[in-house]
């Protein structure tokens, strides 16, 4: 957070101090941050950060109500937009309509529900990650004690709208996991940790004295919106610990084939790789031939006329695809 009162954004937020503290905390590792104030974007802080070449995602911490008879929960929204003055103004215009008061009481009638949020950001590429595990504002506490919920409806909401959840630490998640189990969701545990810090000089200390100790999230991906989204879909890319993790493992690096019929020149990355293409663009040819090349067995190939037997594969891992 940059502002203790989101209705009056802090124009003097010390971005340079925050960056200095993060670099010290991470041992000068590459990092990705989002300044998530309540229901608004602090334009001044974001533009100062971008001017300093900081890797950033535009984001805010929203109040969302499940239904009228319960308190709202907190939910981070991260938006895949270049951080420019015009883009920030456009997002703030939407947030101003949704939240005239940036710090509403959690039971205020004016707080939007999830469908209001989705409709308001129609046309944007965004992720929603509600609070989990924390003592306040967590979505698993946003129903009445003993309330019976329609599991099918709630499962649909979480599977279709939420990409993961946020907390200060990866500990104390039992209530969140138990809530998912009641809904029949067993694998929704993807977490991004957030500091809840308001004073950059004391980063990553939280606003509340009784909050859990902050546990940073280390991500094996590019420091971008897409890197976060990919990591949330593949939990092996996320590590929660204070020290920078060391991970060295080989993988399939490169696939190459060039002749009069075909030109393949593909660099692969560690972890999940996705082959995208239109109809008859060669997706199956590529994957099938890669498998056969690594297996050293082209018996039964349908693509001999393309010379796939000469496919060059750099595979120092010596792994064989399943």
Positions of the model-derived regions?
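Ser/Thr-glycine-rich phosphate-binding loops at phosphate-binding pockets of nucleotides
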Residues: 1-2, 32-37, 284
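Charged catalytic cores and adjacent phosphate/nucleic-acid-binding surfaces used
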Residues: 1-24, 29, 42-57, 64-85, ...
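Divalent metal-dependent hydrolysis catalytic cores, especially in the metallo-beta-lactamase
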Residues: 22-38, 127-129
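Phosphate-binding glycine-rich loops of NTP-binding sites
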Residues: 269-305
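Active-site flanking residues adjacent to catalytic metal/cofactor-binding acidic residues
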Residues: 36, 60, 130-131, 195
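Binuclear metal-dependent hydrolase catalytic cores centered on His/Asp/Glu-rich metal-binding motifs
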Residues: 71-73, 79-125
């Amino acid at each position: 957070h940059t502002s203790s009162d989101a209705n009056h954004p802090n124009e003097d937020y010390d971005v340079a101090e925050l960056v200095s503290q993060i670099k010290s905390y991470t041992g000068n590792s590459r990092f990705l941050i989002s300044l998530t104030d309540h229901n608004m974007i602090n334009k001044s802080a974001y533009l100062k950060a971008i001017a300093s070449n900081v890797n950033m995602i535009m984001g805010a911490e929203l109040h969302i109500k499940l239904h009228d008879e319960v308190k709202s929960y907190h939910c981070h929204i991260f938006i895949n937009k270049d951080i420019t003055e015009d883009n920030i103004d456009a997002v703030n215009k939407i947030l101003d309509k949704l939240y005239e008061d940036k710090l509403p009481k959690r039971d205020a009638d004016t707080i939007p529900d999830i469908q209001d949020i989705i409709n308001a950001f129609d046309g944007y590429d965004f992720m929603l990650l509600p609070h989990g595990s924390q003592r306040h504002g967590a979505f698993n506490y946003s129903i009445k004690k003993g309330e019976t919920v329609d599991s099918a409806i709630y499962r649909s909401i979480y599977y279709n709208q939420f990409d993961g959840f946020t907390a200060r630490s990866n500990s104390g998640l039992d209530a969140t996991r138990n809530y998912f189990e009641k809904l029949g969701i067993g694998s929704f545990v993807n977490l991004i940790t957030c500091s809840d810090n308001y004073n950059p000089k004391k980063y990553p200390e939280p606003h509340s004295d009784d909050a859990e100790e902050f546990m940073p999230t280390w991500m094996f991906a590019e420091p971008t919106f897409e890197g976060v989204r990919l990591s949330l879909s593949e939990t092996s890319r996320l590590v929660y610990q204070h020290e920078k993790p060391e991970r060295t493992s080989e993988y399939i690096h490169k696939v190459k084939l060039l002749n009069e019929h075909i030109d393949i020149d593909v660099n692969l990355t560690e972890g999940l790789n996705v082959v995208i293409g239109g109809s008859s663009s060669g997706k199956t040819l590529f994957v099938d031939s890669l498998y056969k090349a690594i297996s050293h067995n082209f018996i039964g190939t349908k693509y001999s006329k393309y010379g796939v037997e000469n496919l060059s594969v750099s595979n120092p891992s010596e792994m064989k695809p399943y």
